[in-house]
């Protein structure tokens, strides 16, 4: 089997504008980040699978149901599909941060490893885009060598990323220069 490269995206703070300390609990509260459509289309054009990996402990806290989260993701996918930018896979960990026995919570590589197995992905030729240390650490733990950190207010950057951006507005431009070099 020939493995495909992929770009893994965190959701809140990367795909959509961060809700700050809160949660995106409804589709009306979900607002795409500037430049994300162009970035996703570019990944696809260059032959990279696009996969969403997101921690959504709002479900674990009882602030929303799994059904509501699924509906938000379905609406997101519909909007992305209209832009030829839909994700090929969505992986969400709904465990609480302190939940004992959770294997999917970032920085665990579980969501990435599951996506790689289910979609035939080459992690050595892949990239992670995230805004938290745990996103970058998850990529390192999964063996993904290339990472892009989107700097967002209030998220200290202590785990080194290979590239750091001030916002998603320049993500497509950055991906255009990086992706051809990691295949």
How should each PLM-predicted stretch be described?
Residues 15-34, 59-68, 82-83, 95, ...:
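Metal-dependent phosphoesterase signature
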Residues 28-29, 52, 85, 155:
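Sparse recognition of residues in long alpha-helices and their boundaries
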Residues 1-51:
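Active-site neighborhood of HAD-like aspartate-dependent phosphohydrolases
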Residues 14, 57, 133:
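Short glycine-rich anion-binding loops that position phosphate/pyrophosphate groups of nucleotides
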């Amino acid at each position: 089997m020939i493995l495909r490269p992929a770009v893994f995206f965190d959701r809140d703070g990367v795909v959509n504008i961060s809700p700050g300390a809160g949660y995106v609990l409804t589709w009306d509260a979900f607002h795409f980040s500037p430049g994300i459509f162009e970035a996703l289309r570019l990944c696809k054009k260059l032959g990279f699978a696009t996969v969403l990996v997101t921690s959504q402990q709002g479900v674990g806290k009882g602030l929303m149901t799994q059904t509501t989260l699924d509906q938000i993701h379905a609406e997101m996918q519909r909007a992305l599909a209209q832009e030829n930018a839909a994700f090929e896979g969505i992986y969400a960990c709904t465990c609480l941060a302190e939940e004992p026995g959770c294997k999917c919570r970032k920085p665990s590589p579980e969501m990435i490893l599951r996506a790689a197995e289910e979609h035939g992905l080459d992690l050595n030729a892949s990239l992670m885009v995230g805004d938290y240390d745990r996103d970058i650490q998850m990529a390192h733990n999964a063996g993904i060598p290339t990472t892009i950190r989107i700097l967002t207010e209030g998220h200290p950057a202590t785990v080194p990323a290979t590239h750091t951006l001030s916002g998603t507005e320049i993500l497509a431009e950055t991906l255009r220069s990086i992706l051809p070099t990691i295949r």
